[in-house]
A protein has these predicted regions:
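Positively charged n-region of N-terminal signal peptides that target proteins for export
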Residues: 1-5
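Short Gly/Thr-rich strand-loop-strand
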Residues: 71-76, 103-146, 380-434, 467-497
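Structural boundary/hinge residues at secondary-structure and domain interfaces
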Residues: 22-138, 173-244, 259, 263-365, ...
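A conserved glycine-rich beta-strand in the N-terminal activation segment of trypsin-fold
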Residues: 132-211, 428-508
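Bacterial N-terminal signal peptides
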Residues: 6-16
Length: 541
């Protein structure tokens, strides 16, 4: 039910409305798409082909493209950018998109379309061209107007009124370096359509509440309500409180990386703006603690539920706790109650603040993993750990695996648990033992050959953190997860690509979400990492 709401909204953002198209526009549109010039796109594609070892093949293909310095490509100007803009509406059939094609020679382009594509073109006295398309297509005709060196193309003639066109010089005035970009302005949704969408959300919410009543399991019912209301709240925020969405693709040959950026710009002083600002100010002891040198993997999450979500979260936690106690064997009920009492304050806080890191392998090929989780009332959590140990020792008879309160490091108490990990873990970590460090506000764990990593990390302090992040060394990942190549083969290919200095800082795959004035998501990969993966795939087809 909730998913279906996104279908008309997505269609709305892409195709638009003829009615709303009648409003004069001079500089911006509700939806804007920009592509770099054909020459630039071919240059970026050449770089990408080089990353995957196919540059020679690609250049052979490019040589077959008939680009003329004066006539362009079949009359299209290959030196200037391409654009598309439109409006927002639920009336998909009346799409108000306008395509901007740069033209080097209009007659050459018209001749190509008529001779090669078989399109019939009629020029009218008002400057509009009617392009008749083959039958049985999605539309019978297109309409075009040539001005300022660009051919404006639309499905409806009314969209090409000369007074309402966005001048190409205004549309392409800013060059941010993106290969492709999409701008969506939800604040330009027409009032009538906004009311329709909000009414659909209210209707869906009522339907969710009715469906929730049919769930006999309390935990399932609470989870159903929380998930449904979360999606509806996000949808409502997009309609009411988001000003602009920017999606941009960057391909940077000089800095050797590719990235996809999404920026959400809120309405000033809106609840969403305040939430974004709060996310931008968050610090994390867990994130600071896992900041170690030589990491091949590092990630974190750090956010708190909004006030309107916390009540539903509490209901879900209470339902899960009640169900867990109901299903536990009678002989374990007292112990499980004590365990849940220690976990409950952290869960009720409705804060997700955790981080993890993994160092590069040592000479024996073993990794060390370090993780940290923010907790509430850590002393109660320590009591829960003791109860878990009692259950473990009672059920297994092993009274030597767990060693509590081994040492104190600052505010932390160290514990060691032997033989807790599966036998296969020893291949990668060199051990099956787990180290724990507990304090009033943090739970830290470490496993691997570098026992000093945990002790040294405990002296780190809190630091500003992103909402979500994941940094992965692609070479490090290949050493760990590639089943078709030995570590020696991986190292040889890494040396081939990066030289003796190694891949450090040049093979990263990164995902980061940050708050602040806007909410920004960036997914990027360094060129060296792509070259390495391509070479590894070629060596092990």
């Amino acid at each position: 039910m909730v998913t279906r709401l996104w279908i008309p909204l997505a269609a709305t953002l892409l195709l638009g409305s003829a009615t709303y198209a009648q409003v004069p526009r001079t500089t911006t549109a509700p939806v804007e798409v920009r592509l770099r010039s054909i020459n630039d796109l071919l240059g970026k594609a050449d770089y990408i082909a080089g990353l995957i070892g196919q540059q020679q093949l690609f250049r052979g293909f490019v040589q077959q493209i008939p680009i003329d310095p004066q006539q362009g490509l079949f009359g299209l100007d290959t030196r200037r950018p391409i654009g598309l803009y439109g409006d927002i509406s639920l009336d998909v059939e009346q799409g108000a998109g306008v395509l901007l094609l740069p033209v080097a020679n209009l007659e050459t382009l018209m001749g190509f379309l008529q001779a090669q594509a078989g399109w019939q073109i009629e020029r009218k006295g008002n400057g509009i061209m009617t392009i008749s398309l083959p039958p049985d297509g999605p539309v019978e005709a297109l309409y075009a107007r040539f001005t300022d060196g660009y051919l404006y193309v639309a499905i409806h003639e009314s969209h090409l009124d000369a007074k309402k066109l966005i001048p190409a010089k205004n549309f392409f005035v800013q060059d941010d370096g993106a290969v492709a970009s999409v701008v969506i302005r939800p604040d330009r949704i027409p009032v009538v359509m906004r009311r329709e969408l909000l009414a659909k959300l209210d209707e869906t919410l009522q339907q969710l509440q009715r469906e929730a009543l049919t769930k006999t399991n309390p935990a399932e019912r609470a989870g159903f309500i929380l998930g449904g209301k979360s999606v509806i709240s996000l949808s409502r925020a997009l309609i009411e409180d988001v000003k602009e969405l920017h999606l941009k693709l960057f391909v940077d040959e000089k800095r050797d990386y590719i990235s996809l950026d999404l920026t959400v710009i809120p309405q000033p002083n809106s609840p969403v703006a305040k939430n974004f600002a709060s996310l931008g100010q968050r610090t994390s002891l867990a994130y600071g603690l896992t900041n170690v040198k030589g990491a091949v993997l590092r990630g974190n999450i750090n956010f708190a539920l909004t006030d309107d979500m916390r009540k539903m979260w509490d209901d879900l936690i209470n339902s899960i706790m009640t169900q867990a106690l109901h299903e536990v064997p009678p002989q374990n009920k007292d112990a499980v109650e004590k365990i849940l009492e220690g976990i409950l304050p952290t869960l009720k806080a409705a804060v997700a603040d955790a981080a993890i890191t993994m160092t590069a392998p040592n000479a024996k090929g073993h990794y060390t993993v370090l993780g940290a989780i923010s907790v509430k009332e850590g002393k109660k959590l320590e009591d829960s750990i003791r109860e878990l140990v009692k259950l473990y020792e009672r059920d297994t008879g092993d009274t030597k695996a767990v060693k509590l309160n081994i040492a104190k490091v600052g505010n932390f108490t160290l514990h060691q648990i032997d033989r807790i990990l599966p036998p296969g873990a020893e291949t990668y970590l060199g051990t099956r033992s787990l180290w724990l460090a507990t304090s009033e506000d943090l739970l830290v764990f470490s496993v691997g050959p570098d026992a000093s990593l945990l002790r040294n990390a405990l002296s780190n302090g809190p630091t500003k953190s992103p909402v979500l992040s994941l940094d992965v060394s692609l070479v490090g990942l290949a050493r760990l997860a590639n089943q078709n190549a030995t570590p020696q083969q991986v190292n040889a290919i890494a040396t081939q690509i990066f030289g003796r200095v190694g891949p450090v800082g040049r093979d990263m795959l990164r995902l980061e979400v940050t708050g602040g004035q806007n909410l920004t998501l960036r997914l990027s990969v360094q060129g060296g990492g792509i070259r390495f993966l391509a070479a590894l795939a070629s060596a092990n087809p």
